[in-house]
Design a protein with these regions (language model features):
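A late C-terminal transmembrane helix in Major Facilitator Superfamily
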Residues: 368-399
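C-terminal ends and interior cores of transmembrane alpha-helices
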Residues: 99-118, 316-333
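Helix-to-loop junctions at the C-terminal end of transmembrane segments
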Residues: 78-89, 295-307
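Glycine-rich segments within core transmembrane alpha-helices of 12-TM secondary carriers
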Residues: 158-182, 205, 378-389
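Extracytoplasmic gate region of multi-pass secondary transporters
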Residues: 38, 241-290, 386-390
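Extracellular/periplasmic helix-loop-helix junction of adjacent transmembrane segments
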Residues: 41-75
Length: 458
């Protein structure tokens, strides 16, 4: 089997498969850590952010503030590492960010707690979270550029969907490890040292991902752009900013709903609905399995019918179902099986947005600014609508007493995304040999007309 680069030159499919694996492993590690942090948020709050005299709710808010701060460094990482990726290549930047992510996550597993070093503990944790935010900002743009630029014609949706799929696997792995540790250890062991094991497991996985990325080739788009000079032809800044803003609007629903259902849910169920730690983790696992189940089919479907209709369906379903879902979870009369099915379905609906999302963002930018542009659009959306989700929801519930806040938050963000998708449609794949060299203005104009059709298989 052969695949074709942007210049229609046949190449072996081995580099494409290697790129898919190397990009996926890095994404898995990044999101495994976020899954672990979310799952152990109540434990981390007690160990790092809850000195004597501080209430549990206040400690949890501080934990989510640290979580949000890391997200606000993602756009910085996307800008810095994205510019490097557009100048020197995707490969060296992806090597650098996986090393940074692995080191920061492993160090969290050996940090002293508040009981040992006092107020220094939360500052050390926050510093490592900042390093993770910087590396995560560079990871997404590089990984998606890597996967979609190696994708065969007409398969960018499927290849890009692997980024989201490994996000789901990472979150599932984090929640699964947390659930396993909660099962085999008692509460005291888990709180004092058990949670550290989940972070320390990052080290061997990170070393494996680093080895894979050291063996990568540079992407065909970047190599060909370097030869032709296209990577030095940067579009006007105002056009890039307009495309980034459009991208943020399209993916904010995916960001908000994804984090509400997949990351914030465990602590919400424990702190607001008095669920046990094991029950909260089970709900997260079910939601994440549903999320993973629809991502690849949604990406593949978007190669056939377009990114817009698939993502729009997911956004509208979140708007319609968020409040009924939360009311069902609050109802003591509803069986556990029914609640589990609805939680699974909530994750599956988010997968409809996450599957086509990476390819949609990649198709909005030419090679010369792709790493930067798609990375910034995703990082800005996540910084505001994901990183702040836990903080906003927890603080709002605490202040208002309204336990439906998570549903309103996810539904409102998806409503805005639906409007952005309706106004500016995405085709079945809009960059091609010529489109990849076009500036962002041409991409956006074509997008508003409905986009191009997928490239035929050669």
């Amino acid at each position: 089997m052969k695949v074709f680069s942007d210049q229609s030159r046949p190449v072996s499919n081995r580099p494409a498969v290697r790129a898919l694996v190397a990009g996926s492993v890095g994404n898995f590690i990044e999101w495994y850590e976020f899954g672990v942090y979310g799952s152990f948020s109540t434990v981390i709050a007690a160990e790092f952010f809850t000195p004597e005299g501080t209430g549990a709710a206040e400690g949890l808010v501080r934990t989510y503030a640290s979580f949000a701060l890391a997200f606000f460094f993602r756009p910085v990482g996307a800008a810095v590492f994205g510019r490097l990726g557009d100048r020197v290549g995707r490969r060296p930047v992806l090597i650098l960010v996986i090393a940074l992510m692995t080191g920061a996550t492993t160090l969290i597993g050996v940090l002293p707690t508040y009981a040992t070093v006092g107020a220094l503990a939360p500052w050390l944790l926050t510093f490592l979270r900042v390093l993770q935010g910087l590396s995560a900002g560079g990871e997404f743009g590089g990984a998606v550029a890597l996967m979609t630029e190696f994708a065969p014609p007409g398969r960018r949706g499927l290849y890009g969907a692997w980024q989201s799929f490994t996000v789901a696997l990472g979150l599932l792995g984090g929640a699964g490890i947390a659930a396993l540790l909660a099962t085999v250890l008692d509460a005291g062991q888990l709180a004092h040292w058990g949670w550290r094991l989940a972070f320390l497991l990052t080290l061997p996985a990170g070393l494996g991902a680093l080895w894979l990325r050291l063996r990568l080739e540079e992407t065909p788009s970047f190599r060909n752009g370097t030869v032709s000079g296209a990577v030095r032809e940067v579009p006007p800044a105002r056009e890039v900013r307009a495309a980034i803003a459009l991208g943020v609007g399209r993916v904010m629903g995916w960001s908000a709903a994804g984090y509400t259902f997949l990351v914030v849910l465990p602590s919400y169920l424990q702190s607001t609905l008095d669920a046990s730690f094991q029950q909260a983790l089970l709900a997260t696992v079910l939601a994440t399995v549903g999320f993973a189940a629809t991502i690849l089919p949604a990406g593949l479907l978007s190669d056939r019918v377009g990114r817009r209709p698939v993502m729009l369906t997911g956004a509208l379903l979140v708007v319609a179902l968020s409040v009924p879902l939360l009311n069902l979870l609050q109802d003591d009369g509803t069986s556990t099986a029914v609640k589990g099915a609805w939680v699974f379905g909530a994750g599956a609906v988010v997968g409809l947005m996450a599957g086509p999302g990476p390819a949609m963002l990649a198709e909005m930018f030419p090679t010369s600014v792709r790493h930067t542009g798609l990375g910034l659009a995703y990082a800005l959306s996540n910084a505001v609508f994901s990183g702040c989700a836990g903080l906003i929801i927890t603080e709002s519930v605490e202040r208002t007493g309204n336990v439906d806040i998570p549903a309103y938050y996810a539904a409102a963000a998806c409503a805005v995304s639906a409007l952005a998708l309706v106004k500016s449609r995405t085709g079945k794949g809009s960059w091609s040999d010529a489109g990849d060299r076009a500036d962002v203005r041409d991409v956006v104009r074509r997008d508003r007309r409905g986009g191009g059709r997928a490239e035929p298989r050669r």
